[in-house]
Structures are given as C-alpha cells and as structure tokens.
C-alpha cells in the first residue's frame, strides 16, 4: 500500500487525494480511488465508506459484473454482494481487486500500472491509468477538472464480458464504469444533462436552452454526452469521451437517498473484449463551487 498522493494542477490547486486502495477489505473489492474530490474552493464533493454502501469510495473505475473464463461466478470489482437473476443480491466468493503494481508522479499528473484480479488472485486484465488535473474557466465559472485515461488489455487467455446488475436482470441498476459517490450534500440535487430533445413536460426548461433539467427517473439509463448535478454548495459535471467504446454513455445517477453519478457503459448490454483485445477510455470530472447555471455546465463540457 502506497502513501496517498495529492493530485494537483500546474497552479497548485488540489483536485483530490489519490489512494491505491491497498488497505481496503477484500469484500469491498480494493481498487484505486480519489477522495476527497475537491472544488476550487476546497469543498469536498465525494463520500468515503458511507454507511449504506461502505464499498463506495470517492471517484474511480469500478465494474460489478465481469465474465471471466474458468471462474464459477462473475468477477465483482465494484464491492459488496453480486446481483443474480432470481436470487437478488447474494454474497459470493467473487470480490476481486485492481492491484496497483507501479505508480509514478509526473509533471502532468500520476500514472498507475494495474492488474485486475479475480478473488482467487488470477490476473485477467492489465490496465494503464493516468490521472490529470487542470483548472478550467468556462461559462464564467472556475472549475477543477480531473481527467482519467485508461487502457485495458485482456490478458486472461479467454474472452471477457463487462456487465451490470441490469444485464443480469435487475431493471435500472446498470451501474459500473467511471463512478463518483457523491457527498451527502448532493441529496436532492438538481440533475442537468446535455440536450437530446424536448425536456419532459413536468421538468422546468433551462433558461439558456443549453442543457436539460431531468428528473432522476428520466436521467437513469439515458444516453447523453454529459451529465451534472447542482447542489446549493457545489456542482459536478461528468464528461465521457465521444470515442469511448460503445459510443455515448448511458448514465446511472441518483440524487435521492444515495447520491451518486456514474458513466455506465455496461448499463443496458454487456461489452465484450476478445482474447488479447484492448480498450481505450477517457473520462473527465469537473467540480465548481456553488450552484452553477445550466449554460455553464454546457460550456464546461465543451472545454474538456
């Protein structure tokens, strides 16, 4: 387990603190995470080990359901129990890990070399992950942007399939991907998303027309180029790259009860990766102080 390291911009703002996850319980699927994730003013927008889901830690990459040849159960690199159709959530001996083999600091951020392992220690995927932070001014707002670039290489000797509880039979539970467990202050936050058409009739239209305010039900599982949440204290915006595998990302988002935001590429269907195959991903998370207006969300999404 390495010492946590601050992820900073060139102008010395701290976007968050990077942990390798090495000291976390095995049943929580140890993996790297950024926490606290900070706004330019130093307010934390992330949560760590909340009572309802103690395997939720800040910002990171987490996948709940991975089919690996030779394993009795799908590998769980999300943490906690696994959803099985007809049985619900079941505690299985399948909690794997993302083990950081090498981590180094660079002028533009930090780079990690990781092994994805099943519960029995078998390595099935090699990942190179970079973390980069920068200050962004967009829409008249100061933002802190954290960008993660990730290369996944299948080293298992067989095909892999990445899924979610929804691909396993549970509706509206397609979580897994680039995940942020939000701070409790985001309970009841307003959801703002890229416009893809008319807003639902029961949701007020945004003043600038640059985005759409969505109910949680309408946002859940929808496919949009970006999605954000606005609370009285802070705002967050998540932007997946347009050329990520599978195209525009579906979203898993909650602002009631358990606030969280996840670009969830495996929400509706499994993503398959053949023997020796490689996937490239890029995601950005932007934070700002206070309740950002809709047009500023859109401007920030265009800036990364």
Model-derived segments and spans:
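Residue-level recognition of well-ordered beta-strand positions that form the cores
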Residues: 113-115, 130, 149-153, 179-181, ...
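Beta-strand-rich N-terminal accessory domains
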Residues: 1-66, 159, 163, 286-292, ...
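Intrinsic-disorder/low-complexity, polar/charged segments enriched in Ser/Thr/Lys/Arg/Asp/Glu/Gln
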Residues: 107-111, 143-147, 276-282
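Extended, loop-rich substrate-binding clefts of extracytoplasmic carbohydrate-active enzymes
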Residues: 60-142
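Extracellular/lumen-exposed scaffold segments
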Residues: 26-78, 194-197, 204, 210-221, ...
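Active-site/ligand-binding surface loops and adjacent short beta/alpha elements
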Residues: 158-246
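Beta-strand-rich recognition/accessory modules
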Residues: 236-304
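Acidic (Asp/Glu-rich), glycine- and aromatic
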Residues: 18-37, 139-192
């Amino acid at each position: 387990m390495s010492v946590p390291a601050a992820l900073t911009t060139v102008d010395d703002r701290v976007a968050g603190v990077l942990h390798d996850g090495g000291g976390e319980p095995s049943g929580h699927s140890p993996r790297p995470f950024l926490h606290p994730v900070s706004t330019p003013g130093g307010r934390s927008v992330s949560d760590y080990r909340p009572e309802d889901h103690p395997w939720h830690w800040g910002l990171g990459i987490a996948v709940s359901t991975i089919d690996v040849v030779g394993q009795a159960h799908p590998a769980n690199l999300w943490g906690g129990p696994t959803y099985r159709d007809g049985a619900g959530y079941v505690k299985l001996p399948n909690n794997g890990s993302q083990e950081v083999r090498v981590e180094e600091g660079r002028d533009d951020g930090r780079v990690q070399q990781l092994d994805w392992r099943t519960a029995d220690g078998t390595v099935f995927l090699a990942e190179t992950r970079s973390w980069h932070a920068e200050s962004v001014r967009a829409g008249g707002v100061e933002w802190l942007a954290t960008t993660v670039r990730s290369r996944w290489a299948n080293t298992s000797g067989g095909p892999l399939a990445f899924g979610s509880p929804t691909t396993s039979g549970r509706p509206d539970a397609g979580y897994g991907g680039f995940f942020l467990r939000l701070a409790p202050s985001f309970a009841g936050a307003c959801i703002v998303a890229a416009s893809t058409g008319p807003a639902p009739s029961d949701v007020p239209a945004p003043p600038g027309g640059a985005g759409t305010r969505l109910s949680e039900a309408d946002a859940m599982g929808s496919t949009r180029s970006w999605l954000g949440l606005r609370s009285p204290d802070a705002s967050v915006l998540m932007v997946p790259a347009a050329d990520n595998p599978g195209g525009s990302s579906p979203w898993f988002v909650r602002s009631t009860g358990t606030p969280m935001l996840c670009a969830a590429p495996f929400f509706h269907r499994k993503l398959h990766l053949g023997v020796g195959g490689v996937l490239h991903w890029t995601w950005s998370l932007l934070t700002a102080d206070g309740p950002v207006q809709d047009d500023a969300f859109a401007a920030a999404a265009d800036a990364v």
